[in-house]
């Protein structure tokens, strides 16, 4: 059970805690320049650092290890349309350039990604079964990755293929991939980095799906061997946001409990002297800054977030947390029971790189202090802004990864660059105070139009989950195909809806629809910590379904009782809106993810009947654009969800 990994000046031990097996062996690496001999582009001064000191006043000699971290790349090969803090940012080649520059500068480093490297991908990656972004990550010399919820979109067997290599059931569609000794093959070689799954267990064996933790060993400046342990986790609630087939046969454990168990038992596995002296948790769960986010800030200190609750229960030996999932950026410290921890997150789509410095005691191997800086991964000569067209800066891209990007952009171009229609204005995911989104309205309208005919479902209303809407459609965005302003390509539409879900139409009562809408919220104020309504998994702030034009309802997310959050409901009968009574029955369309209770909307699964399957969501979306020609799709008014008196 051995596998060789790219490595920089160290030796890895990958430990499957459940079975105590060594899974990898050492690999020699090129020399690196001293860290103080290279200027890192984009690095900030030490005055911008938040340093967490664990030495308790002790004066000790230390060795620095840099942990380079990113998350939620979601197969973003080409960076078109991504920006942050007024800068065009992200994309695999540009992220790779920054990562490689820092790897070359540091004497000791580890590169990790915190989940969702694959899944919900643009067409150029999704069309080739997530292989391109994995190859790009190999070229970045990523060492370890936590699994994210989207790693399970296609099931654990497909995730194992992503790790180990081999062709997809559709055939060997990628490449050609270079062979180490020369020549090439069209057989996908797998990930050179190791996925970790501390809290994901196979039901049939009780073992973790991937190794529960991995270690990196370095020599301190005084010659002592130092071992750093890396845990890799995903949110425990993954089964509520992934299709049931994606997580079949797996149990997702409490994050803190699983991490603590591994840390506490580590000395009992393998050679005791290889047990980590310092621990880093790489976890696909996160939080948000409150108010206006700052690149290296922590407004609100993650109060009330899922990641804060987990961090507060961690073993004191876990002092550095690389987090993810929320697509937010922050650099925070949280102190619990006298233990202060450093927590980072690097936004999404390769727009930010987190650089965490671990200062480790040369003699004991214990963590003395930790600091971190988030840096924007810029990719253009110009600043971003409304209506501004990006001017790419090739000097900021890694040529090796750019070649991969160019290869797959070209391969997907005949399909990706096909113009499917036009938009009259920007269709965004920006929500009203009650949670309605312009782009969400349009998607729900498209799915209704597809399933309205009696033979295709006879739908009266349609619902869309907000998490399935992955990107905005902006008039000024120009894809590699060079379409005109306002034109929408198939590739852009696919980026908005990349999951390949199919439409399902079911019969529901008015009461079931009311209960469904209540499941959007928690008890008490929407932003509070009350229990979710009717057994749902609604987060703080709610999870508001997007609705078709044929449906209206009154909403008060802050009502104390779940039963009081939804008021009157109306449905269009073909002539006018009429009130929907609890005793009425009607046909309702959703995607197959929602139909099976996804996102905690169990009413779709348990209180609906007579299911009829239908078209794929992307096909419905494309057909809707074509039907709107030549005028194009207008930006809808946000008047479908109205305040409850």
What is each of the regions a protein language model found here?
Residues 13-25:
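Bacterial N-terminal signal peptides
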